[in-house]
Structure formats: C-alpha cells, structure tokens
Amino acid sequence: MKYMTVTDLNNAGATVIGTIKGGEWFLGTPHKDILSKPGFYFLVSKLDGRPFSNPCVSARFYVGNQRSKQGFSAVLSHIRQRRSQLARTIANNNVPYTVFYLPASKMKPLTTGFGKGQLALAFTRNHHSEYQTLEEMNRMLADNFKFVLQAY
C-alpha cells in the first residue's frame, strides 16, 4: 500500500481551497459556500512549490449534507477543541496544511478505479447508488492508501 500524494489528488481533480494552521485559516478564509460543500477534504503539509516535490497527504476528512451547512468548519472546530489524537496533533504541531477539496462525484480514481489504467477506469462503476455512503468511500480510501497522520 502506498501513501496518497498530491499527484493522486490532482489526477482525481481536487482543488486547493486554502491553508490551515492549528485549526485556523492561515492566509485568508475561504467563503462559507466552499466550506459547506459535501465531499472529502485532504490535508497536505509541506506543499513548497518545488518542481519535483510530491508531498504525501497527512489526513483526510469527509463532510456530508448538513442542515447547519457547517461543513469543513465543523472539522476545524473539532481540531481546535482537540477532540481526538489526530485533532490534538494538527492543533499543536504548528505545521501549515494545504487543504484540498474533492467532491464525492470525483472519487472514482481513488476508490473503485484505483490502480487501473485509463481504459479500465472508463468501465469502472461510479459511486451513484442511493445507498453509497461517504463512510464507505472513506473505507475504500483506507484500503487503497496510507495517510501520514491516520492509521485507518
């Protein structure tokens, strides 16, 4: 099993939405409409811009549809409150993390289509079942990749 990298995220179509440090936005806060989108949010440390740099993904979080529309802001609140070992690590290590967003509709290359060529990927099923959950996709990510700060 390999570590997920920025290249994997870029190939799937992820977008950078900002940078956090200690559970707070660093260098500007994205608009609430961006932060409330359901999907997956990936944290990457040391995104330094070197041409051959391909840092590993430190952690992943998913956000479903919420009536409150808190989205990723709720994740940041959990980090600031240090509600888990992962949250305590991110809150206390003084490391800036670049936040990538990927909607569930673009998860196929990282889940059911992982490790397949372009032709095979075209014939791999999409995630569109009414019973397909973000939790299930999260487990598929854990089956296919390792993350620096997460064991599962």
UniProtKB/Swiss-Prot annotation:
Outline what the protein does.
Disorganizes the host nucleoid and inhibits replication, but without host DNA cleavage or degradation. Only the architecture of the nucleoid is affected. May act on the host chromosomal sequences that determine the structure of the nucleoid. Binds to dsDNA but not to ssDNA.
Coiled coil: present as a keyword of the record? no
**Pfam families per UniProt:** Phage_T4_Ndd
| Record keywords, A-Z | DNA-binding, Host-virus interaction, Inhibition of host DNA replication by virus, Modulation of host cell cycle by virus
A GO term, aspect molecular function: DNA binding
UniProt-recorded name of the protein:
Nucleoid disruption protein
Query: In Gene Ontology terms, what is a biological process of this protein?
Result: symbiont-mediated suppression of host DNA replication
Q: Which organism is it from?
A: Enterobacteria phage T2
* Gene that this sequence comes from: ndd
